[in-house]
């Protein structure tokens, strides 16, 4: 019960923090005047809190292309229209959350499988793999996204077969390629971390004792070493999710994907921005709390 109350307090503090950050410009700017305006700032905060309590009344602005032909010239203009927040926001919200958690699961699975496999290899081969992975970690995320898009398009042009969808549209959203791209950097970081922890665990006395008992290296690694390693890895879950969120913002821009972050960055009403931020952050915060609970159970 105490932890539940603490979690609710954290969520309330998040809401207050988001609200103050979103309303901060009104503290210094009033129309075209620049100064220090406390009253409009507090009024904006009160309006945001009031609007959040009535989500059915929230409206979001969406820009749509409108085709016009003035003077026999075809012109496409962007026209902004207001729509109710629900159910319009549900599809981009589910898409972004699905990418985050899909990439998280993929990165954990790939890191676990690759680290166990690499730990079983001879030392010379393991050193080569670790060096190659260290080089991959220096590759910027934007470059990797462009490279994957160009690779998919090049394969399609040469063999006339579209392996993965390189561009996301509202009618045909790209799923597999974004998950692979988003999981790239977290997989490498987890892989390096797990290899380091495995090497440290292999120096422990219980590993020497298990080898003396005649247990195989695979059995010792999976049954004893990895159980201790996974507990330490759970301490880095927040970092992994933070990397995924920042990469998701870059991905939505480069893939022209209509996700929740692109909506937040498109200049919505302050109350809508705060509500969408909470809608996006709370599930991620819930996963962090769940993994912390699992870690405590493992220690117990």
Question: Each predicted region: which residue ranges?
Answer:
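Generic hydrophobic transmembrane alpha-helix motif, especially the helices
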Residues: 130-185
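Transmembrane alpha-helices
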Residues: 9-17, 218-248
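Glycine/proline-centered hinge or cleavage motifs at structural transition points of membrane proteins
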Residues: 214-215
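Non-cytoplasmic
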Residues: 23-32, 235-265
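Membrane-cytosol interface at the C-terminal ends of specific transmembrane alpha-helices
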Residues: 168-211
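Transmembrane alpha-helix signature in integral membrane proteins
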Residues: 85-117, 233-239
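Transmembrane-helix boundary motif in ABC transporter permease subunits
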Residues: 103-134, 146, 248
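Hydrophobic alpha-helical transmembrane segments of polytopic membrane proteins
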Residues: 178-186, 255-297
């Amino acid at each position: 019960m105490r932890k539940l109350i603490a979690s609710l307090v954290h969520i309330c503090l998040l809401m207050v923090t988001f609200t103050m950050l979103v309303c901060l410009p009104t503290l210094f700017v009033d129309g075209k005047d620049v100064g220090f305006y406390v009253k409009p700032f507090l009024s904006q905060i009160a309006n945001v809190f009031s609007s959040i309590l009535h989500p059915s009344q929230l409206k979001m602005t969406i820009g749509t292309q409108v085709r016009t032909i003035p003077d026999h010239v075809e012109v496409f203009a962007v026209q902004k229209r207001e729509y109710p927040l629900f159910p319009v926001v549900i599809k981009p919200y589910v898409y972004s959350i699905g990418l985050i958690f899909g990439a998280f699961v993929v990165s954990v699975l790939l890191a676990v499988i690759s680290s166990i496999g690499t730990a079983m290899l001879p030392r010379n081969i393991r050193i080569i793999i670790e060096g190659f992975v260290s080089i991959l970690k220096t590759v910027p995320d934007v470059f990797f996204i462009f490279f994957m898009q160009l690779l998919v398009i090049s394969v399609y042009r040469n063999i006339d077969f579209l392996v993965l969808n390189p561009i996301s549209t509202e009618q045909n959203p790209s799923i597999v390629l974004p998950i692979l791209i988003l999981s790239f950097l977290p997989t490498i970081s987890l892989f390096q971390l797990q290899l380091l922890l495995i090497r440290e665990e292999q120096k422990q006395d219980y590993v020497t004792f298990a080898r003396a008992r005649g247990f195989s290296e695979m059995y010792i690694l999976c049954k004893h070493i990895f159980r201790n390693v996974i507990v330490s890895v759970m301490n880095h879950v927040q970092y992994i999710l933070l990397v995924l969120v920042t990469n998701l913002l870059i991905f939505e821009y480069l893939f022209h994907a209509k996700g929740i972050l692109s909506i937040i960055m498109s200049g919505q009403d302050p109350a809508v921005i705060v509500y969408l931020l909470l809608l996006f952050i709370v599930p991620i915060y819930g996963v962090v709390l769940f993994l912390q609970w699992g870690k405590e159970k493992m220690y117990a």
